[in-house]
């Protein structure tokens, strides 16, 4: 089916702009450039037909071209209807790589785009690179006949990893998977430092609101929530956290944040950010108690955290201010400003995470694809992690760009600590 349409993007004439953006990003993505230097000659991904379902951004374009440089064939779709950067998609299409993504897809178009990535000229996909689990779920439910030919899955994000573990527990996961999200150089960098910058970018571009002096409510205090809370506090907001986990709640309290329930916080907040990866976080009962023109947004993967359906069914009026910014008039006379329709605000209203931090995440993705493709015997059906040594290698590949100088252990010190001078330096159970 995909032979009839080599790509589908919003505007192929944006390719030149996209290429310039890629050139800039490459200089900020030392990990991926290091992968090209190490593996372009040996082509460890030769024969791999990778179907990718991950936000079609400039940074993802650099990842795609890295996979191709390492020998893979690639077909791509975005994992969110609003996250595609159309100039990046155009640049990839112009380079001859099949991509099916544009900003503002309908749900039906979104599914169609994913389905275009399943068949290559030499046969169906044999590798999956996923973000959120939609591609993985589609193959397992609608195209199970393709499963036997798939060597592995690498999963990018917390939500997708939860999905893999749920599938494994139910006995329905049929393909080995690597949990990229919980590599230290992903979760402790992308989730934390990436969100710390891109959340504010999304809110500011959408509303131009003054954050200083406001009350911001952050639902969830995992790595994403921590980054969001730091950013909002840094801009002068008073931050309130909501949490279900006593450990995370205690962490938030020890950092000086007020921790309470959404039932209480909804009356205080001016800005609300959901980061939980769970459903039903902000409901109609909360909207009804919010202040006038409260800003509500989500930075978790799916649009299930905010009850947008309630707003659409119960608001007196909905006014679109500009793309991805809607103002709802409630029956009580107060207004709610909803960003990105409750989907990822940093990608719907801004450009997502900066290139440098995405280089960390995507270098892990490349290594995971190489591991699964070249060492299939090491990975039975299940959810696996990249070795600690590779995690450290990803970090080291990014140090030079920041002029970081590592201290080198002496042989005596290494023996004292019981580690190799070359690493890994921490046990697998170490919590960074």
Curated annotation (Swiss-Prot):
Residues that bear N-acetylserine: 2
GO BP terms in the entry: one-carbon metabolic process; S-adenosylmethionine cycle
Pathway: Amino-acid biosynthesis; L-homocysteine biosynthesis; L-homocysteine from S-adenosyl-L-homocysteine: step 1/1
GO molecular function per UniProt: adenosylhomocysteinase activity; NAD binding
A single cellular component GO annotation: endoplasmic reticulum
Disulfide bond residue pairs: none
Pfam families: AdoHcyase (PF05221), AdoHcyase_NAD (PF00670)
Residues annotated as binding substrate: 57, 131, 156, 186, 190
UniProt remark on cofactor binding: Binds 1 NAD(+) per subunit.
Residues recorded with modification Phosphotyrosine: 193
Reactions accelerated catalytically: S-adenosyl-L-homocysteine + H2O = L-homocysteine + adenosine
Entry-annotated residues carrying N6-(2-hydroxyisobutyryl)lysine: 186
CDD domains, alphabetized: SAHH
Sites bearing Phosphoserine, chain numbering: 183
Subcellular location: Cytoplasm; Melanosome; Nucleus; Endoplasmic reticulum
Enzyme Commission number(s) of this protein: 3.13.2.1
Enzyme class: hydrolase
Positions of region (NAD binding): 183-350
Main location: cytoplasm
Family, per entry: Belongs to the adenosylhomocysteinase family.
Subunit architecture: Homotetramer. Interaction with AHCYL1.
Designated name of the protein: Adenosylhomocysteinase
């Amino acid at each position: 089916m995909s032979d009839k349409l080599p790509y589908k993007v919003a505007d192929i004439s944006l390719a030149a702009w996209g290429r310039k953006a890629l050139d800039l990003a490459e200089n900020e993505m030392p990990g991926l450039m290091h992968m090209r230097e190490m593996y372009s000659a040996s082509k460890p991904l030769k024969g791999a037909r990778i179907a990718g379902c991950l936000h079609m951004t400039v940074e993802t374009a650099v990842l795609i071209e890295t996979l191709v440089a390492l020998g893979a064939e690639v077909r791509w779709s975005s994992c969110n209807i609003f996250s595609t950067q159309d100039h990046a998609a155009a640049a990839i299409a112009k380079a001859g790589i099949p991509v099916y993504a544009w900003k503002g897809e309908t749900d039906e178009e979104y599914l169609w785009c994913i389905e275009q990535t399943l068949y290559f000229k030499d046969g169906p996909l044999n590798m999956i690179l996923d973000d959120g689990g939609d591609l993985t779920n589609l193959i397992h439910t609608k195209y199970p006949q393709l499963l036997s030919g798939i060597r592995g899955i690498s999963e990018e994000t917390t939500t997708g990893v939860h999905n893999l573990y749920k599938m494994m527990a139910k006995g329905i996961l049929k393909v080995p998977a690597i949990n990229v999200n919980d590599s230290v150089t992903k979760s402790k960098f992308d989730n934390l430092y990436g969100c710390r910058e891109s959340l504010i970018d999304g809110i500011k571009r959408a509303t131009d609101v003054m954050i200083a002096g406001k009350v911001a409510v952050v639902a969830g205090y995992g790595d994403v929530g921590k980054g969001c809370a730091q950013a909002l506090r840094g801009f002068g907001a008073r931050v309130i956290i909501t949490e279900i986990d006593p450990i995370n709640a205690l962490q938030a309290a020890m950092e000086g944040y007020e921790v309470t329930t959404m039932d209480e916080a909804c009356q205080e907040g001016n800005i609300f950010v959901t980061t939980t990866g769970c459903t039903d976080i902000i409901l109609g009962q909360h909207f009804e108690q919010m202040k006038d023109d409260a800003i509500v947004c989500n930075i978790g993967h799916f649009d299930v955290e905010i009850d947008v359906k309630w707003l659409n069914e119960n608001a007196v009026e909905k006014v679109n201010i500009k793309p991805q910014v809607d103002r709802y008039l409630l029956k009580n006379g107060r207004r709610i400003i909803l960003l990105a329709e409750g989907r990822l605000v940093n990608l719907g209203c801004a450009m997502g995470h900066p290139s440098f931090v995405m280089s960390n995440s995507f270098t892990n993705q490349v290594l995971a694809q190489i591991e699964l493709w070249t060492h299939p015997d090491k990975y039975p059906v299940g959810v696996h992690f990249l070795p600690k040594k590779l995690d450290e290698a990803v970090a080291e590949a990014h140090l030079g760009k920041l002029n970081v100088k590592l201290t080198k252990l002496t042989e005596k010190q290494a023996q004292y600590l019981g580690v190799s001078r070359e690493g890994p330096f921490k046990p697998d159970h170490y919590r960074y």
